[in-house]
């Protein structure tokens, strides 16, 4: 019997997206962002959808693909220090339910934004560029790859 020993993950970043209610909270946060943008009087519906998509994807890129390391003191001897949150997610195992959810969610938001903007060329280009900026880093072939040495250290 291990008395006084905490039963937790070596790196809490690996399982935080699998927590109870995390996906629901994520979806509610995106919905709340959209409602706030719709409540601004001078934003039309297409502008609100495009801004929802772009802000969501910008936040996803920053928090999952740009920020490296972990906010916790981990006993892994610095292994997580050089990994992005996406690379730490589910211990780097590809095609888990969390990774699928966070890959599908920007695609669904993209389809909604494209539909409600009536496929306007300007909105379509912005939404497509925003989508590609978060989908390309999620590809399994780019796990641990730093293009042009960006975000290497």
UniProtKB/Swiss-Prot annotation:
Entries under Pfam families matching the protein: ORMDL (PF04061)
Subcellular locations according to the entry: Endoplasmic reticulum membrane
Keyword line: Endoplasmic reticulum, Membrane, Transmembrane, Transmembrane helix
Assembly, per entry: Ceramide-sensitive subunit of the serine palmitoyltransferase (SPT) complex, which is also composed of SPTLC1, SPTLC2/3 and SPTSSA/B.
Name recorded for this polypeptide: ORM1-like protein 1
Task performed by this protein: Plays an essential role in the homeostatic regulation of sphingolipid de novo biosynthesis by modulating the activity of the serine palmitoyltransferase (SPT) in response to ceramide levels. When complexed to SPT, the binding of ceramides to its N-terminus stabilizes a conformation that block SPT substrate entry, hence preventing SPT catalytic activity. Through this mechanism, maintains ceramide levels at sufficient concentrations for the production of complex sphingolipids, but which prevents the accumulation of ceramides to levels that trigger apoptosis.
PANTHER family per UniProt: ORMDL PROTEINS
Cellular component GO terms, alphabetical: endoplasmic reticulum membrane; serine palmitoyltransferase complex
Domain notes: Ceramides bind to ORMDL3 N-terminus and stabilize it in a conformation that physically restricts the accessibility of the substrates to their binding sites in the serine palmitoyltransferase (SPT) complex, hence inhibiting SPT catalytic activity. In the absence of ceramides, the N-terminus is flexible and permits substrate binding, thus liberating SPT from inhibition.
InterPro entries membership: ORMDL (IPR007203)
Transmembrane region(s): 27-46, 47-64, 101-121, 124-140
Family: Belongs to the ORM family.
GO biological process, one term: myelination
């Amino acid at each position: 019997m291990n008395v006084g020993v905490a039963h937790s993950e070596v790196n809490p970043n690996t399982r935080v997206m699998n927590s109870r209610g995390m996906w629901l909270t994520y979806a509610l946060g995106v919905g709340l962002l959209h409602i706030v943008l719709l409540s601004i009087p001078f934003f039309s519906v297409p502008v609100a959808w495009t801004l929802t998509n772009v802000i969501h994807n910008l936040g996803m890129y920053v928090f999952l693909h740009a920020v490296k390391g972990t906010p916790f003191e981990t006993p892994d001897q610095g292994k997580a220090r050089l990994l992005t949150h996406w690379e730490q997610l589910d211990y780097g195992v590809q095609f888990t339910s969390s990774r699928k959810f966070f890959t599908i969610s920007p695609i669904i938001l993209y389809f909604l934004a494209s539909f409600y903007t009536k496929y306007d060329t300007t909105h379509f280009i912005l939404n497509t560029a925003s989508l590609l900026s978060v989908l390309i880093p999620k590809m399994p072939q780019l796990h641990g790859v730093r293009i042009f040495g960006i975000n290497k250290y």
